[in-house]
């Protein structure tokens, strides 16, 4: 087994310090070689992995490591590697000609940091480089066994002796997704998929998972190759968490329109149930080509209900975008129908926006050190919130569609500028980003996945937090689908913890 090397200031050596549980994790990563590192989000997966890789460098086990990570985290990885080591790191980014130069630099670098999309495009360059270790950060990117991305990463990882998958939630919603991740880590652990399927998954008439079984057996089979630490395991080293659920009532006009759209949604759901003999199967509904139109009817109404909860202006904006001939295939036909029928004419208030702005104002006024991270599903909503908070503070947007460099610039401004105290992010934008300089997090609306909710909250629940306690505030419209959504997420979270 390679010896641990935590000396200071020497080439290819880790220059930081680790908590005892991180040191234990490094030892197992070095001893076994193929490991699923399942430390809870915020517990230091990155620094733990860097320590392990540096020890491999020092013991001459490897001379180059490939780090595959979401695009939004590439520069965060670069900074962490430079912070804790003297190793050379190159980030593969930019247009084709610039990436070609990056790959040439990779020949003389210890770490290559790349997102899977760039890797897929640049395989001719990668094939000229020899890596002996691979790290996949946010390993849920491998959860699909059939995706091109997953197949490619597993293929290039196969000859590498050291394979590390990093995730805060090894099981998000589906054990079969864990199986796919384990195919990357060590395919011998869970064996052939047919056996795994029979042992752990109960399927319905259409072949879709109905429920899961023998989960303790699954857990036991992973003990040799998985390192798992929950928040409870390291609670004394994390900031205290204060949860707030803030109910917001509709105004009269908004409530009336919400009821109207809800009745319309219920009608289409009943039509779908009638089609399937009174037993509505969501999977069959979504996977039956003949049901595409009905699926669109249901989802369009759900989306407009969510827009109405967030800010009625989103419905109007979506309607106008749909009507714009310069923006084909954008906007919502149903939102346009609602707007053109005059149903939005009396809906002038946005109770949730007002409540959130008031909350942010109070938080920022309470202490000049307070900083706020806010998540919302709709990117357009983030822009509306930014406009509404202009007089309170400078803010940055961080969302899908921005380049990795733009995201990194936004993060650095929020981190280093005392006057930039609001970080506005979409779920796609904020995946895995470390924001220990913030002590308040607002879920303006809720995702459907408990894993995404954990991802949101873990942005500020971190070992590196600058505060003894952090506050997570969730805003929920009363009498709306958001109340049920919140309950479902709490149930999913309980199941995941179990």
Per-segment meaning from a language model:
Residues 2-38:
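Conserved pre-motif I regulatory segment
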Residues 62-64, 83-86, 107-108, 133, ...:
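Conserved P-loop NTPase motor "coupling/switch" region that bridges the ATPase
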Residues 97-131, 144:
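Conserved helix/coil segment N-terminal to the catalytic DExD/H
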Residues 120-124, 173-175, 382-386, 408, ...:
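SF2 helicase motor core recognition
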């Amino acid at each position: 087994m390679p010896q641990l090397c935590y000396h200071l200031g020497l080439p290819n050596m880790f220059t930081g310090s680790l908590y005892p549980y991180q040191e234990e994790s490094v030892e197992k990563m070095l001893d076994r070689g193929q490991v699923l590192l399942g430390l809870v989000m915020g517990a230091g997966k990155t620094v733990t992995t860097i320590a392990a890789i540096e020890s491999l460098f020092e013991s001459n086990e490897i001379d180059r490591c490939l780090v595959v990570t979401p695009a939004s985290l590439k520069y965060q990885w670069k900074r962490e590697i430079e912070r804790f080591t003297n190793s050379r790191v190159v980030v593969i980014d930019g247009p084709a000609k610039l990436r070609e130069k990056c790959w040439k630099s990779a020949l003389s670098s210890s770490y290559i940091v790349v997102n899977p999309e760039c890797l897929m495009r640049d395989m001719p360059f990668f094939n000229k480089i020899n890596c002996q270790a691979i790290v996949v950060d946010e390993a849920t990117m491998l959860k699909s066994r059939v995706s091109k991305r997953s197949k490619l990463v597993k293929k290039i990882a196969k000859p590498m002796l050291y394979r590390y998958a990093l995730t805060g939630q090894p099981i998000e919603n589906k054990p079969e997704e864990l199986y796919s991740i384990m195919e990357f880590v060590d395919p011998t652990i869970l064996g052939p998929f047919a056996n795994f399927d029979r042992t752990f998954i109960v399927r319905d008439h259409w072949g879709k998972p109905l429920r899961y079984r023998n989960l303790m057996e699954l857990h036991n089979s992973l003990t040799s190759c998985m390192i798992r630490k929950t928040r409870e395991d390291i609670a004394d080293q994390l900031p205290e968490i204060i949860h707030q659920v803030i109910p917001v009532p509709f105004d009269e006009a908004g409530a009336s329109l919400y009821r109207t759209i809800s009745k319309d949604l219920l009608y289409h759901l009943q039509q779908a149930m009638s089609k399937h003999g009174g037993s509505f199967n969501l999977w069959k509904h979504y996977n039956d080509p003949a049901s595409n139109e009905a699926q669109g009817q249901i989802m369009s109404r759900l989306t407009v209900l969510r827009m109405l909860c967030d800010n009625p202006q989103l419905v109007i904006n979506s309607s106008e975008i749909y009507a714009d001939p310069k923006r084909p295939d954008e906007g919502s036909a149903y939102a346009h129908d609602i707007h053109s029928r005059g149903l939005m004419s009396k809906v002038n208030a946005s109770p949730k926006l007002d409540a959130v702005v008031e909350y942010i104002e109070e938080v920022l006024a309470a202490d000049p050190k307070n900083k706020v991270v806010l998540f919302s599903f709709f990117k357009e909503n983030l822009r509306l919130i930014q406009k509404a908070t202009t007089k309170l503070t400078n803010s940055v947007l961080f969302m899908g569609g921005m380049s990795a460099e733009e995201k990194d610039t936004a993060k650095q401004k929020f981190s280093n500028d005392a006057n930039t105290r609001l970080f506005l992010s979409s779920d796609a934008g904020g995946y895995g980003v470390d924001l220990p300089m913030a002590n308040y997090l607002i879920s303006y609306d809720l995702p459907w996945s408990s894993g995404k909710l954990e991802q949101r909250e873990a942005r500020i629940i971190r070992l590196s937090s600058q505060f003894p306690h952090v506050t997570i505030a969730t805003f929920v419209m009363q009498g709306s689908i958001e109340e049920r959504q919140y309950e479902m997420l709490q149930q999913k979270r309980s199941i995941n913890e179990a």
